[in-house]
């Protein structure tokens, strides 16, 4: 396996591929003109877009420039991500099945639109186990800013029908990362340890009688909570980080920003956390896409590039897989001054852990409406991720209610070998 861990940078709300990674000069030429019917005929359109005969093209709202030795054309709104163009592989031919945020996130995270399935991080913990016993193996953090802050349901990091010890743990971005990390006044760590040993002894007796795996999970969770009272304060104490690191990320300790979360993500990676998921809410740009992209770029551009550069400098990028992207794309048609949800095409990029830096794969049509070449499904993305972790996606299964479930579903998923070194 090339990867030991995954950092998933989820740009929640549906980033526009047309203002980030997918260069469309023909769309710019048709700006303000009617959307050619040849693209939309027979297509189911989002309800928010209005009648079909009023659809107008909206040209890219930001200039694209070549970045890196690979010369990849990328939005000039994200110059810092442009500076790592030679480290990332871009896939411009993604599509999804769900046009609303929550089910689209559910599909991206679990490979199914049916709530209650295990999330990516839970599957990884089930398949590989944790690489640390001092912190949870699956950690989630959220930030917001730049647009409408769509809520992120906790089931996006749930373990579903897998044992609950595999579910993600959400860290707070401000204040104590987890509740009750400090003991109440008058309760020493020794007192807490004695209480924990007594409770676990009783749970062990109950487990021997009932043979319930959730009792074993409860014991493990109590033990993890006790360890986290020591490990979490050390994790979030960034006071020993040098000033140049804060400058690199653009982070201010404790401000709850995406930049601060990226710095914590690096520290989680150093400590062996298997799956780290950062959500940044603010990409739902139904209006003012030009200004909103500028705003959200101010939140995520510098920190995203800093995370890649920092991991690379520390020798961690070679075994850390980074995935950047959202739940769907945006329409090439205007919705006022913005763009509507779009499932036929969107872009993601990957870096680290055996990814071919500077590579590009797939293409959309000349307006960015639909995939035209080398389609990549969400399940293909999952299969590729698992491959880099040394997992055969067809063999990572769990029997539930008489069926063998897997992250990549029952249809054939393809590993995107073209973005692998």
Regions found by a protein language model. Name each.
Residues 1-421:
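Ligand-binding pockets and gating/stacking loops
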